[in-house]
Amino acid sequence: MPLDRLVVVADAHLGRGRDGITDLFLRFLRAAPGLGDGLLLAGDLFEFRFGDAHEPAAHAPVLAGLAEVAARVPTTFVGGNHDRWGSLGWATGRGIRAEAESVALEVAGRRVVAEHGDRQGQVRLSRRVAHALVSSPLASAVYAALPAAIAFPLVERWSARSGAHRDDPVWRARAAERQRAAARARLGTADAPEVLVLAHSHVATVEELMPGRWLVNPGAFYEGGRHAVVGRDLRLAQLS
């Protein structure tokens, strides 16, 4: 279904324990249908979320809010490195289109392709190897088989370790540059979209990398409600 104005949000990392972020995101969800006629959740919405069997109760208000938005405007989720594991039934069961890796949309006459951007943004070789391991179907299957009393502490410990760098400006700059280089190569191909959405680096960006070809990164929602709007024009925004 073609859209006129797509609201893009990513990297809220809900469940990480930051004060007020869940309430801010719920306020964003209430506002979202008035900001555009479609909503794209570009990964790492949750710090960790691995299917309904391992659903933290703290996420219940957000999941209810997402279902309400999806009943009003087309809503799409593409998984991030923190929340693509396991079943996507939590999303599809609430009327949300969900893809683990990549999604294509038509917005204001433009072809938009969205991915989380973690594959393009990993800086260290050790992190790229770790990312490949924890994103594998085997890791998802092992996690799904674990009792919640073991599974939750395990991923919380891994999350704290793997996410310790995400507020480091040096890491962000390097991740953003890797993404930019990957985006430039992708946008230069014959079947390139007009707009490529990548998140993960937490560096908010709207940049025309070549004539008529744009890179959009909405930034990290947990930093004051950052998001982006893709339509006839492309812009960054913040929840006021």
Feature map (PLM): residue ranges:
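Core catalytic region of metal-dependent phosphoesterases/phosphodiesterases
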Residues: P2-V7, L14-V107
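Active-site environment of divalent metal-dependent phosphoester hydrolases
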Residues: G15-G17, E47-F50, T76-G89, R119-V123, ...
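Structural motif
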Residues: R5-L6, D37-G38, R110-V112, V195, ...
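Active-site-proximal loop/helix segment associated with metal-binding centers of metalloenzymes
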Residues: G117-A181
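Binuclear metal-dependent phosphoesterase catalytic core
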Residues: L105-A108, E208-S240
